[in-house]
């Protein structure tokens, strides 16, 4: 079994700089695991969960696998003997072992003891926590490596655990209540479980139910985004009645790193591309909005968000540029809505109805943020038109829809996992079905 922590990520082949856990880091990992098993978050175990034994053989095999920097899980996981997770931080200097382990611990609150699996409505991964407290696992090993552009840490547990439908340990009570209520608005931030969700009908509510946060009034007038002195020619109408491709109006592919900020990246990418469509592509390589500004200002930050909240929050104050509030891939405490330097402004935002026809009609005007469900097959996408073998009804990730090809009936999306993923950071998805639950919720777009 295998799952990637917080974000579903692929890692390209790179040359290793150095690797290995320090004695202090190993002790931190051991201490966390001892605490998780001796005092588990959740119902009291019927019997004490035995402490895991550090297995040097597992650790060495895992180290050898990680040092390849190819993003693949070890053969122990591939053969199904071990449960395994990986977490990476980019750039290297952002590596934070305690934050990684804290994120795993947070997953305990999202385990549904009645359903015997992660709370499907919470859209927060809890499976890594079940690996760590699986009562039948007896030993484990962990490893760390530093590649040129990222740091990776991984743990592998023997024998494998974390199976959906099986409790990680036997509680004293037989039917405990779920530890966390399901939120009313999806938070597409965390890795998808490998087990498909039940095929229940998609919600019929026309827009997300969580109210958008109140926009703070700036204390001083914020400078507006400078517009080109002469408007650029508009894009020629597509030759087909439905086919459209806005790829040539995209800023470079970004990488959200070890932070559940896909919602911010998709929303800022929509702003950037729609600006270029209206005013020309002179700033195509330089226009970059601050995703950190969004992560700092909107509730939950690296733990999730929604495009509607993003566009509503920054409609009045505007959003900072990357150079003024650079991305750190962590939830900060300083929400900046005013400054002496220019902020990027837009007029308003809207959303589409939950139909293919409505989505394609809006796509003719420019890219639209869409929510999708990501599973292991999605994360391993390389090229071609992806067709999910499983029909999902929930979502856990936000991307930017940039095109549609009528001949192949396929969408084209821009992701935020770096240019080494998929087709240089992009992906094509069949539009012949809604297996990824695109129409479970409304899709959003900004206007100028």
Swiss-Prot record:
The keyword Signal applies. The keyword Oxidoreductase does not apply. Residues 30-157 form the SCP domain. SMART domains: Pept_C1, SCP. Its EC number is 3.4.22.-. It is found in: Secreted. Keywords: Glycoprotein, Hydrolase, Protease, Secreted, Signal, Thiol protease. Residues 171-242 are annotated as: Disordered. Residues 1-19 form the signal peptide. InterPro entries: CAP_dom, CAP_sf, Papain-like_cys_pep_sf, Pept_cys_AS, Peptidase_C1A, Peptidase_C1A_C, Peptidase_C1A_papain-like. Glycans are attached at residues 55, 98, 119. One of its GO terms (biological process) is sexual reproduction. Disruption phenotype: Suppression of cell fusion. This is Gamete and mating-type specific protein A. It comes from Dictyostelium discoideum. The gene is gmsA.
